[in-house]
Amino acid sequence: MSDNTTLDNISVNSEKVVDYTIHHDDRKELERLVSHNKGVEKIVSELAEGAGQLGPLEQPYDIHKVETHPDPHTDYNDADPWKYPIDKETKLRLVDWTEGDKHNPKNFGKGFKWLCTVLLGMICFVVALGSAIVTGDLERPAADFGVSEEVIILASVTMFVIGFGVGPLVFAPMSEEVGRKPIYVVTLFVAVVFIVPCGAAQNIATLLICRLIDGTAFSAPMTLIGGSLADIWEGPERGTAMAVFSAAPFLGPVCGPIFGGLLCDYAPTWRWVYWTFLIVAGFFYVVFIVVVPETHHGILLKKRAKKLRKDTGDSRYRSFNELQIRTFAQVAKTSLLRPFVLLSELIVFLVTMYMSVLYGLLYMFFFAYPIVYQEGKGWSASKTGVMFIPIGVGVIASSLAAPFFNKDYNRRAQEYRDRGELPPAELRLIPMMIGCWFVPAGLFAFAWSSYQRLSWAGPCFSGFAVGFGFLLLYNPANNYIVDSYQHYAASALAAKTFVRSIWGACVPLFTIQMYHRLGDEWATSLMAFISLACCAIPYLFYIFGARIRTFSKYAYAPNMD
């Protein structure tokens, strides 16, 4: 705001322009008024965007009438220390964050933000670790239970990953009603507790059921952590934080066979795989619950409005969340039906298929590496597990490159904004167009260097290219879906997660048979050819994506000439 004592032509809406003449002593009050005006406009914008998808607004609240508030239809109650605007027609008082609000998660100190980010990433790492650590020691539990290799894979790996796909359909919408922290507390507690019967199981049925429960409960943090990071980080800063988080789902499965292989060779029983996982998961659960607070803005503002109503006796305080009414049918439609409807969208379908191929590759490696190194070269489980390290190094290298691609995106997007245009969603595809080639290149290198007579180094170091490509594909794909579907992005991502998890759960059931029948070289080459064909997907959408969205009733597409 200018230092002049006269402020002319403050526009509070598109139709009315009001002249104000103020003295220096009134400047602070005017600044607060303008600040709250922006806050109301923000809430009104959210109401207008969310009304169509989140259910009808509480009557008689009229968002069209509120667009001219707080001037000239809004007053401030001087006795109210919160200084929230009062709507003269509806008498409601809109509760939103005030400037510099210390309770706003985005205003947390940077050190605390990074502490929360690291803990969120570690929880995600631990969850992903739980899906893979058991693959290092499958023969001993199969012998104990008297079941085949396929059955023990079904019980210990497949059921866990199926839970990954089912859980998000329930936990994501539930977190919008009760907040993220209660979901974290309850689901992680259930997940940690059910590791115990897995380790103590006396029959295969117990292991199968408990691993399914574990996978479902552990899916909650994998679903909610992205939202938690968005709660605490501003847009320009979020890219680096998301790079830390997004590496965790890949590093966890990579480290799983390493730890599992060591336990297989040196632990007295296979049950120590679960006891070790219990210790790690339990430790991070306690630290996480103690340190990380509730960050969901809607829930925090709802609690503030409730407290204000109680403290002041004024029932007019309302948060944005309280201006929504959603029936059970609406919630069920949003969380259970819409994701499957969106799978009929070409963009969602093809991106989902691509991500499913990548996810399947990750779980295929858990069984391909033992075939190549343990069966082919006679190595131990622990030595074989070390061969996964280059994949992890590739993932880390890709995450370090993420800020560069994020900076490039911001530069390209700003060029559109400078011309008064919206940046197209297809700008998100540029890293995919680069990263897509690394995966088939790494797979072909793995395939044709896996002969028994050749060095171990070929299959080992080819994993770097695959790991590097994974993250360059995963993050941009999610961003592309979000930018393409805007309000329906959560449902589109839920659909992707469900299909990806189901496919990832199925891959271990046929990988061993595929390698034994096709041979190490052609089995891996088959997946390499499939991933090579998928390279066309980002290029297809980069060229035709904007036009494809114009034919969709769900996708967002700017007007095209």
Swiss-Prot record:
The chain crosses the membrane at residues 114-134, 151-171, 182-202, 212-232, 243-263, 272-292, 347-367, 385-405, 429-449, 454-474, 492-512, 526-546. Induction: Expression is induced in presence of cycloheximide, 4-nitroquinoline-N-oxide, and 1,10-phenanthroline. Expression is up-regulated during biofilm formation. Expression is also increased in high-iron conditions. Expression is decreased after combined treatment with fluconazole and osthole. MFS transporter involved in N-acetylglucosamine (GlcNAc) uptake. Confers resistance to cycloheximide, 4-nitroquinoline-N-oxide, and 1,10-phenanthroline, and contributes to virulence. The keyword Transmembrane applies. This is Major facilitator superfamily multidrug transporter NAG3. Keywords: Cell membrane, Glycoprotein, Membrane, Transmembrane, Transmembrane helix, Transport, Virulence. PANTHER family: MAJOR FACILITATOR SUPERFAMILY, MULTIDRUG TRANSPORTER, PUTATIVE (AFU_ORTHOLOGUE AFUA_5G02700)-RELATED. Its main location: membrane. Pfam families: MFS_1 (PF07690). Belongs to the major facilitator superfamily. DHA1 family. Polyamines/proton antiporter (TC 2.A.1.2.16) subfamily. Disruption phenotype: Leads to increased susceptibility to cycloheximide, 4-nitroquinoline-N-oxide, and 1,10-phenanthroline, but not to actinomycin D, fluconazole, ketoconazole and colchicine. Also leads to attenuated virulence in mice. It is found in: Cell membrane. GO terms for molecular function: transmembrane transporter activity. Glycans are attached at residues 4, 9. One of its GO terms (biological process) is transmembrane transport. It is a multi-pass membrane protein. One of its GO terms (cellular component) is plasma membrane.
